[in-house]
């Protein structure tokens, strides 16, 4: 714990994650010192009652605490990580292209996080899917048309915030410009500034116009703007403030990610991000308590050394406090919206009805860090036998007496999946349907692998 107003302001900028179903002891001094927020992950979730108890315990220590979560719907869910999301993700909503339905789904997601005491949803993803090869965006994007993405980002923001949960559009100024994963490296986007204005920025402008209370920066270097990752580049956050007129909270993506920049470690990255204009510093869940506490100390020491102004730290803390004061989460249940959206997002070609008893072969690529390992699949919804294969696994012998269902995931990025497709198969693509197999019995595109998406596909396959 640090002493005095500067230390409290520094604590207000921090949003750490932590392990476990309860509040760890090391977090309590930070809460007492005015910690701004925490970010919950699947590792903090057992069931709604437990999460509600956890958030209540945290706020008993710090009543103004913001509690954030990545609850995007579809492939990225924390509250339903064990079962899969009851709501489809952005690509499915973009495929339907009904902004009223997107608004309704977002309100339903907001209502579910509100019910357990969460008041900041790190959604929607506002990245345009410029490169289908990108693993970090993929089905998390509403699509490849900037105007379509913009109108659905606005609708999602409006839906979330209609139930008093703050939206945080991400990843400014756009992660869809590069195929690299910023969890693992610093991606570089070489598009000219005018191209960014035409292609990447419209969804973020729409989010600002819709009243989004927060925006998250990308750990991507945009050569048209500067030499640093966007999170620590004053030109990038200046663009957000001046050109888009955004006055809300600017939050960083997790600073322990490889793409965050700052060779001096997490504390140095935090100082650089604040100096660049960020307000809230996401620290993820993989840092030690000493690293989190050290980040607060690093901010104070940077001010004392004249590398960061005290006014900047207090300005950031003020924005965190203003967001906390704005939130008023109101529980709201509407899972029917998720089922409707998932059904409408399905694209079916050919005879997809297999009934019960099919052999289901699920081809699973390595998971992304953002989505995590899926714990559910289509096979369990269809009955019969399910075989799950990773790259390099030998396929099972085919039994021509029963139907074959092949479940793919971003086959356009994985040649090994494409090589296993046979003409007799009903092929179900649960990722971005950028590759369409020829001469198969049927092809089904779900536009996502959330439970709602897979349930909709199962209804079609069972008949």
Segments and roles (model prediction):
Residues 1-67, 74-81, 405:
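N-terminal hydrophobic targeting/anchoring segments and the immediately downstream early-domain regions
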Residues 17, 43-67, 75-79, 144-307:
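Second-shell residues forming the walls of enzyme active-site clefts
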Residues 36, 119-120, 213-214, 279, ...:
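Short acidic/polar active-site loop segments enriched in Thr and Asp
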Residues 97-118, 200, 209, 269-275:
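Alpha-helical scaffold segments that flank or form the walls of functional sites
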